[in-house]
């Protein structure tokens, strides 16, 4: 997302991504608290929850809850997973010249295996590998940044100048105005940290904590790490290496930057890291959306949903990156609207939970 934001909105998009993330901390805190407060158990006794539950139970609007469920099924289950498949296919084509249809079939098969029943095995593997890959990615990024320290101040200048005058920041390389900088910064920031979208509450609902506000604080920490550490590293690698050329976009821009910074291994480095990150995202988004399929129509249509997701994953491998991102922006917005309405309507509920947590914490008690 960050590479696309820079390529389409200029370096200034990063500034607006920071602004969106700053305000998103309050948003994601509220989402996590409400997910905890309005969670329930399914027919098998498993914890479940999310915006559909706090919209229907908290606001008392089953219509708005149904609208959200339909929107998230399309936004994450279908379009969102197209984005991930598109990124994987693009990365492996750039790095290893693997045809997109080959990567598409590979992604289709592995995703199908996961959805049908291999989730525990893959989840166990991902649990071990993703933190390792994240650490390797951070080390690779820091290596490039520290070997290009002279470019850090210039990168900061490009970000702050570009936030209000994108043409001046890039010398006209990126033909974007302030509207594009704000739009793509906020949109890609939303896609990256998911604050306000209504996706992460499904994960927060099943977390076992002593107090709802405790999960809210954990959500804030997660957002901070995602946007202000990982995303910033990618942004500074792109800007410090001078990879921005006005024509390269998406994952190809990130790969170009890492190749300039690490040499020929940069392409493959990004492709392999992305494979792990994108697959865990596909799994997570599939199950977030599946919860809403069950909320709407029960388990009888889950198989149909599963087949459709696999079809969209395959299609995502072939489509042009710009079209995929435009579709993602549209449906992410539709998903966020009912969720934000609920966050505003239930703000007093969140406030009371936070007040209770603070009162107990300051009194030396264990908040629960």
Question: Where do the PLM segments sit?
Answer:
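Transmembrane helix-boundary motif of multi-pass solute transporters/channels
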Residues: 1-20, 200, 205-207, 214-215, ...
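Transmembrane helix-loop junctions in multi-pass membrane proteins
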Residues: 1-5, 11, 78-89, 113-125, ...
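Flexible loop linkers connecting adjacent transmembrane helices
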Residues: 2-14, 18, 28-59, 244-261, ...
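Extracellular loop-to-transmembrane helix junctions
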Residues: 6-46, 225-233, 267, 329-342
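Helix-loop-helix module between adjacent transmembrane segments
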Residues: 23-45, 51-115, 272-282
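Extracellular/periplasmic helix-exit of transmembrane alpha-helices
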Residues: 29-37, 140-158, 166-173, 205-209, ...
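Membrane-interface loop-to-helix entry segments
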Residues: 86-92, 98-160, 293, 298, ...
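A generic transmembrane alpha-helix motif of multi-pass inner-membrane proteins
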Residues: 180, 301-355, 366-368
């Amino acid at each position: 997302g960050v590479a696309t934001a820079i390529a389409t909105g200029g370096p200034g998009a990063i500034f607006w991504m920071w602004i969106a993330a700053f305000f998103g901390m309050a948003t994601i805190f509220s989402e996590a608290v409400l997910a905890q407060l309005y969670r329930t158990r399914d027919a098998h006794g498993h914890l479940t929850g999310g915006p559909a539950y706090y919209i229907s139970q908290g606001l008392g609007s089953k219509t708005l809850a149904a609208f959200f469920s339909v929107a998230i099924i399309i936004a994450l289950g279908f379009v969102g997973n197209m984005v991930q498949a598109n990124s994987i296919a693009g990365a492996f084509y750039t790095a290893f010249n693997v045809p997109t249809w080959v990567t598409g079939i590979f992604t289709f098969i592995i995703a199908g295996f996961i959805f049908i029943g291999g989730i525990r095995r893959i989840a166990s593997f991902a649990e071990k590998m993703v933190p390792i890959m994240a650490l390797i990615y951070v080390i690779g990024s820091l290596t490039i940044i520290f070997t290009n320290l002279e470019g850090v101040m210039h990168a900061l200048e490009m970000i702050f100048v570009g936030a209000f005058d994108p043409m001046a920041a890039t010398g006209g390389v990126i033909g974007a105005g302030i509207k594009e900088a704000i739009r793509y910064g906020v949109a890609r920031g939303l896609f990256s940290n998911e604050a306000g979208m209504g996706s992460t509450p499904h994960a927060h609902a099943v977390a076992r904590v002593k107090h709802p506000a405790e999960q809210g604080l954990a959500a804030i920490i997660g957002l901070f790490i995602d946007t202000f550490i990982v995303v910033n590293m990618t942004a500074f690698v792109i800007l410090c290496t001078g990879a921005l050329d006005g024509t390269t976009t998406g994952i190809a821009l990130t790969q170009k930057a890492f190749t300039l910074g690490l040499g020929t291994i940069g392409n493959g480095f990004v492709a392999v890291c992305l494979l792990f990150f994108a697959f865990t995202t596909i799994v997570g988004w599939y199950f977030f959306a599946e919860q809403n399929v069950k909320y709407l129509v029960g388990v009888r249509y889950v198989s149909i949903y599963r087949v459709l997701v696999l079809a969209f994953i395959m299609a995502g491998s072939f489509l042009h990156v710009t079209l995929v991102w435009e579709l993602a922006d549209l449906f992410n917005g539709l998903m966020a609207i009912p969720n934000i309405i609920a966050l505003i309507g239930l703000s007093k509920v969140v406030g009371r939970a936070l007040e209770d947590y603070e009162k107990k914490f300051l009194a030396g008690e264990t908040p629960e």
